Design a protein with these regions (language model features):
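Flexible glycine/acidic-rich beta-alpha junction loops that bind and position SAM and/or redox cofactors
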Residues: 114, 167-177, 202-222, 241-264, ...
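Core AdoMet radical
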Residues: 72-87, 94-120, 126-149, 154-203, ...
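Residue-level signature of tetratricopeptide-repeat
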Residues: 342-343
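Conserved, mostly hydrophobic/aromatic
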Residues: 53, 66, 105, 162, ...
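Long, highly charged, low-complexity intrinsically disordered interaction regions
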Residues: 255-326, 363-408
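Catalytic cores of alpha/beta
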Residues: 145-156, 220-236
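Flexible, acidic/Gly-rich N-terminal and inter-domain linker regions that tether
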Residues: 1-64, 360-361, 368, 373-408
C-alpha cells in the first residue's frame, strides 16, 4: 500500500481524538488541496480564532482490547503503519505549504508499548533536530509507556496527553481490561503535568502547553461527579491543563456495539462544568448534581447554580467585582473583564451597552440590576423539548471505523 493511502487511513483513525478548546464541527479549510487527505483538522484556539493541525496515528495495529475502539485487536480494519521518517517528511511537506501549523501524533499499541512510543519519539526528534521545526507538537502517550519516555516526550513536545478513559480502576476495567488506571495512566499523566509545569518556568525553554486527558463517557457506568472529581483534583494541582469528554457512540464490530449511546447533552454538560471549575472560580460542591451523581441534562450547570441562589442575586452590574460577575449566566471571563474595565471610564446606561460588552442579555437580565433597577422581572422561560435531551432519532451503532468518540 502506498504512503498516501496509509496516511489517509491513519489520519482518519486519529480524528476522533480531541484537541484545542473544542473540536470544530466543520471541514478543514484546506478544501480539495492534494494534501488535504493526510489529516488536516481545524481546532479552536483559547483566545479565539483557529489553527490547522495534521493529526495522524503512526500505526493502527493494536494488541489492546478496548471495548469502544474499532482498531482493538479483534477489529476488522486494515492494519497499516508509517515510519518516523515518513511521518516527519509528510508533516514538513504539509507545513511548508501552509496547510498545518502543528502536529498531533498518536499510535496503536502493537505488542510492547515502549517500542511504539520509541517510534513516536523518533518522529518528534526528527522534526526538532533534522527538520528544525520549532512549532506546536502534541503527543498522545500510550498506556504502558515508561517514565523515561515521558521525560523525553516532555523535552520534545509542547503538549502531552494521556487518556484516563474513566475515573477509576473499576470503570477502566469495564472499558479496557488491558489498561491500569491507578498503576499506569494516572501516574503517567501526573508525571507529564509536573514536567511540563517545570519547563514553563525555565527561561528560553520550548513553550509548554500543559497536559490533557480524555474520558469516554457513559459505557462504564461512571457518574459525572466522579469524572469531575478527578479532573478538579488534577487541575487544582496544576497537573492538568484541561480535560476532554467524549459521549460514547457504539461502533459495529466492537465489544460494546450493543451498548446504548450516551446523550450528546451529557458531554456538553461536562464541558460546561469543567469550564466553571477551571475558569469561573466554582468549586465542585457548588455544582448541582442529581441523586444519581450526574449533571442536569435540561439546564446548564451555571444556570442551575444561579436558580438555586436567590439570596446572591440580583447583582449591581456597575459595582460588583469581576469574580461575582462570573457567576451571572450569560457573562463569561472576557465579558466580565470588559465590564470591569469599561465602567472605569464610561457609564453603562442600558441593555445595549451590556450587549455591546458581550453580555447575553436574555440570559443575564434577571440576575442583574443597572443603577438599582432590575433588568428583568423573571428568569427566561425554558423551552420544552420534543425529545429527551441529547437523544437522537436513531441509536443504531455506527458502521464506520471512525466513531465520534475517543478511542486512543
Amino acid at each position: 500500500m502506498d504512503l498516501r493511502r496509509r496516511m489517509e487511513l491513519l489520519a482518519d483513525a486519529a480524528l476522533a481524538d480531541r484537541e484545542g478548546v473544542a473540536q470544530l464541527r466543520r471541514p478543514s479549510p484546506v478544501g480539495k488541496h492534494p494534501l488535504a487527505s493526510v489529516g488536516i483538522a481545524a481546532v479552536r484556539l483559547p483566545g479565539g480564532g483557529c489553527t490547522n493541525l495534521m493529526r495522524v496515528m503512526q500505526t493502527n495495529a493494536c494488541s489492546l482490547s478496548c471495548g469502544y475502539c474499532p482498531t482493538f485487536r479483534g477489529g476488522n480494519v486494515p492494519r497499516v503503519s508509517i515510519s518516523p521518517d515518513e511521518t516527519a517528511r509528510t508533516f514538513m511537506d504539509v507545513h511548508r505549504k501552509g496547510l498545518a501549523s502543528g502536529l498531533f501524533l498518536t499510535s496503536g499499541v502493537p505488542g510492547r508499548a515502549a517500542r511504539a512510543t520509541d517510534r513516536m519519539l523518533a518522529t518528534l526528534d526528527l522534526l526538532r533536530r533534522r527538520e528544525g521545526f520549532t512549532g506546536y507538537v502534541h503527543i498522545k502517550l500510550l498506556p504502558g509507556a515508561e517514565p523515561a519516555q515521558v521525560e523525553e516526550a516532555a523535552r520534545l513536545a509542547n503538549r502531552i496527553s494521556v487518556n484516563l478513559e474513566a475515573p477509576s480502576d473499576v470503570y477502566v476495567q469495564r472499558l479496557a481490561h488491558d489498561k491500569n488506571f491507578s498503576g499506569d495512566l494516572l501516574p503517567k499523566l501526573e508525571q507529564a503535568g509536573r514536567l511540563l509545569a517545570v519547563r514553563r518556568g525555565v527561561p528560553g525553554a520550548r513553550p509548554a502547553s500543559g497536559a490533557t486527558t480524555q474520558f469516554v463517557v457513559g459505557p462504564a457506568g461512571e457518574h459525572d461527579r466522579e469524572i469531575l472529581t478527578v479532573v478538579d483534583r488534577l487541575e487544582r494541582r496544576r497537573l492538568l491543563h484541561h480535560a476532554h469528554f467524549s459521549a460514547f457512540q457504539p461502533v459495529v464490530g466492537t465489544p460494546l456495539e450493543n451498548h446504548p449511546a450516551t446523550p450528546a447533552a451529557r458531554e456538553l454538560r461536562l464541558y460546561q462544568a469543567e469550564h466553571l471549575l477551571r475558569q469561573y472560580g466554582f468549586t465542585l460542591d457548588e455544582l448541582a448534581f442529581g441523586l444519581d451523581g450526574n449533571l442536569d441534562l435540561e439546564r446548564d450547570p451555571k444556570t442551575a447554580w444561579a436558580r438555586a441562589q436567590p439570596a446572591f442575586f440580583p447583582l449591581e452590574v456597575t459595582r460588583v467585582p469581576y469574580e461575582a460577575l462570573l457567576r451571572v449566566p450569560g457573562v463569561g471571563p472576557a465579558t466580565a473583564r470588559t465590564l470591569v474595565e469599561s465602567r472605569r471610564t464610561t457609564t453603562l446606561r442600558g441593555r445595549e451597552d451590556l450587549r455591546a460588552a458581550g453580555v447575553d442579555v436574555v440570559r443575564a437580565a434577571y440576575y442583574l440590576t443597572l443603577h438599582g433597577r432590575r433588568l428583568a422581572a423573571a428568569a427566561p422561560a425554558e423551552q420544552l423539548r420534543l425529545f429527551a435531551p441529547g437523544s437522537h432519532l436513531t441509536q443504531a451503532p455506527y458502521r464506520t471505523p471512525v466513531p465520534p468518540c475517543a478511542y486512543r
